[in-house]
Amino acid sequence: MDTYAVIGNPITHSKSPFIHTQFAQQTGRSMCYTTLLAPLDGFERTVTTFRENGGIGLNITVPFKFEAYALATRLTDRARAAHAVNTFRFEQENEILGDNTDGVGLVRDITINLDFALPGKHVLLMGAGGAASGVILPLLQQKPGLLAIANRTPDKAIALQQQFVNHGNITGGHYQDFIGQQFDLIINATSASLHNALPPIPADLFHGTALVYDMLYSSKLTPFLEFASTQGVTNLVDGTGMLVEQAAESFLLWHGIRPETQNVIRQLRDELHLHAS
């Protein structure tokens, strides 16, 4: 049976095995999908061992997306643009194809599942790590009026601005730099919610915002979404839909078929609430 896994640290919280099990049943594929904990200093070693034991492909999550980019021997165009990789497909001659499905997963969830049109909108993206860099190009391809990147370390946000400056109207800086501006959509791409923490976003930035989105998923509102709700935002969405949509893109890369996602999103929400009760 073909073996796949999601690799990260921490990893026990991951719902990727649940999602890919649903996809396999839906499409009639025989596959084993599990979690793989890698030491913070042992990503490449863990990947090599997994492959030597017959692994076919991997999903990569926090904090290894930049290391995965460096380890891949071939890259898809979207992974090359992102400088970050969240999917490996192992190929012949020890080749590793690296892809990044985060951006298309996010955009599909926002534009299709949530029916939120991005053209002309002002978007604030919080964070400048692997999760953020993976979604910038797909967001810009939707032609927003502005994509602003805010980060605790502004130099990293400015570096991303310079990396993607030819793809659309993009700017970068510290959170405080955007006080007084109004955004239609605010996206949290930091890992703060993973640690039950709140990014340093000024309350002022939520004024007039139509949709607030946390790329991490939870059985209840994340601290970021809870904070947004106290500022009067009512359209609050976590990353459950994005997780399923990006997983479907990985499944497509591995198996040549894109599974249906709507039912799986509903099943995953039920699963999250079941384990929270």
Curated annotation (Swiss-Prot):
This is Shikimate dehydrogenase (NADP(+)). InterPro entries: Aminoacid_DH-like_N_sf, NAD(P)-bd_dom_sf, SDH_C, Shikimate_DH, Shikimate_DH-bd_N, Shikimate_DH_fam, Shikm_DH/Glu-tRNA_Rdtase. Shikimate binds at residues 14-16, 61, 86, 102, 217. Belongs to the shikimate dehydrogenase family. GO terms for biological process: amino acid biosynthetic process; aromatic amino acid family biosynthetic process; chorismate biosynthetic process; shikimate metabolic process. Keywords: Amino-acid biosynthesis, Aromatic amino acid biosynthesis, NADP, Oxidoreductase. The keyword ATP-binding does not apply. It catalyses: shikimate + NADP(+) = 3-dehydroshikimate + NADPH + H(+). NADP(+) binds at residues 77, 127-131, 151-156, 215, 239.
